[in-house]
């Protein structure tokens, strides 16, 4: 077991990828990523793989299923801790077999030096989706 939110708490993290219908009916778990964090080193950093990789791997599982679900529209929703650029690049490399959405809570810096909100809202919106 490894540290959780606080170093004194011990346990494991679980990141499921699950499927639901447009009517919100659960279909089941497609993939599960489990890990225990390593302790922080003297500089306050943790070793091991970046935890944001779990979002990329979840998208890859959806992409693997795309051939068997050609008549189904697939959407992948990543949490705000997902690596936006890495997910965009991986989706593009796989041919975008599923729509994707990354929830974002912060105005992140982009590789070119721009900020996310300004970049994303620079052009006129091409559509809008409302979630009840």
Where are these regions (language model features)?
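Conserved, well-structured functional cores that handle cations and Mg-NTP chemistry
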Residues: 1-132
């Amino acid at each position: 077991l490894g540290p959780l939110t606080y170093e004194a708490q011990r346990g494991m993290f679980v990141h499921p990828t699950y499927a639901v219908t447009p009517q919100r009916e659960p279909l089941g778990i497609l993939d599960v990523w489990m890990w225990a964090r390593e302790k922080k080193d003297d500089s306050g950093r943790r070793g091991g793989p970046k935890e944001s990789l779990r979002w990329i791997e979840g998208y890859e599982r959806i992409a693997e299923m795309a051939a068997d679900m050609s008549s189904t529209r697939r959407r992948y929703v990543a949490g705000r801790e997902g690596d936006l650029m890495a997910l965009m690049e991986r989706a593009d490399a796989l041919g975008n077999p599923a729509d994707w959405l990354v929830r974002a809570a912060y105005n992140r810096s982009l590789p070119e030096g721009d900020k996310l909100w300004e970049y994303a809202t620079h052009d006129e919106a091409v559509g809008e989706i409302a979630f009840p």
